[in-house]
């Protein structure tokens, strides 16, 4: 279970237990990582549908979209390796690379 880190509240005890978000992830996937760790340790991961959050300015991904796509997919590889082991990461690597390539191809301007 995981929720978007765009708006995240966590108990201080959970932060002490796991430390902060894993800085090896660049901008993406650290919330998934933290959520999986919390879930495996027996913490509840809760979505509050009545909460309203406005992300007024979000331009990080727009500045260098290809670099952000690559960073996201590198983070996915790290996530698989961290949580499921080297063998799973080796199996997942071609799929992650293919998905990265496909996303980048869709993002290219037309002919």
Language-model region placement:
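A recurrent flexible, glycine/aromatic-enriched loop bordering the glycosyltransferase active site
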Residues: 1-17
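A short, conserved beta-strand element in the Rossmann-like catalytic core
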Residues: 9, 26, 33
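Nucleotide phosphate-binding site architecture
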Residues: 15-16, 26, 54
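Conserved nucleotide-sugar donor-binding catalytic segment
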Residues: 20-23
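Active-site-adjacent helix/loop segment of glycosyltransferases
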Residues: 29, 33-110
């Amino acid at each position: 279970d995981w929720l978007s880190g765009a708006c995240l509240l966590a108990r201080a005890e959970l932060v002490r237990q796991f430390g902060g978000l894993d800085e090896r992830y660049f901008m993406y996937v650290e919330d998934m990582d933290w959520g999986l760790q919390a879930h495996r340790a027996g913490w509840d991961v809760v979505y509050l549908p009545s909460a309203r959050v406005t992300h007024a300015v979000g331009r990080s991904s727009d500045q260098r979209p290809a670099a952000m796509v690559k960073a996201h997919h590198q983070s996915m590889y790290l996530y698989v390796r961290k949580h499921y082991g080297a063998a799973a990461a080796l199996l997942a690597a071609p799929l992650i690379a293919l998905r990265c390539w496909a996303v980048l191809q869709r993002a290219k301007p037309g002919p």
